[in-house]
Amino acid sequence: MAANPSGQGFQNKNRVAILAELDKEKRKLLMQNQSSTNHPGASIALSRPALNKDFRDHAEQQHIAAQQKAALQHAHAHSSGYFITQDSAFGNLILPVLPRLDPE
């Protein structure tokens, strides 16, 4: 039941190597950013992250739409109520529709 110290050491070395690689990449990106701000013709490189962000936003919206559809189908299959998809400040994918009954 003793922990395997060699396996733990390997994991730590792996983590250190990953962190070092990330730090090196970060420094490289910072250097590229500094050089592009010094040269006005290098603004093309700055527009690419915006394109990637738009692509990520679109992919995220498609993922949310798929989740909403799945939640809506599940709710309709397992409940006698009626539900709609609606953006919610509380993160709900679907909301129940409750009928208003006139007081008698």
From Swiss-Prot:
The keyword DNA repair applies. The modification N-acetylalanine is found at A2. It comes from the Eukaryota. GO terms for cellular component: nucleoplasm; nucleus; SOSS complex. Keywords: Acetylation, DNA damage, DNA repair, Nucleus. It holds the Pfam family SOSSC. InterPro entries: SOSSC. It is found in: Nucleus. One of its GO terms (biological process) is DNA repair. The keyword Secreted does not apply. Belongs to the SOSS-C family. Component of the SOSS complex, composed of SOSS-B (SOSS-B1/NABP2 or SOSS-B2/NABP1), SOSS-A/INTS3 and SOSS-C/INIP. SOSS complexes containing SOSS-B1/NABP2 are more abundant than complexes containing SOSS-B2/NABP1. Interacts with INTS3; the interaction is direct. Component of the SOSS complex, a multiprotein complex that functions downstream of the MRN complex to promote DNA repair and G2/M checkpoint. The SOSS complex associates with single-stranded DNA at DNA lesions and influences diverse endpoints in the cellular DNA damage response including cell-cycle checkpoint activation, recombinational repair and maintenance of genomic stability. Required for efficient homologous recombination-dependent repair of double-strand breaks (DSBs) and ATM-dependent signaling pathways. This is SOSS complex subunit C.
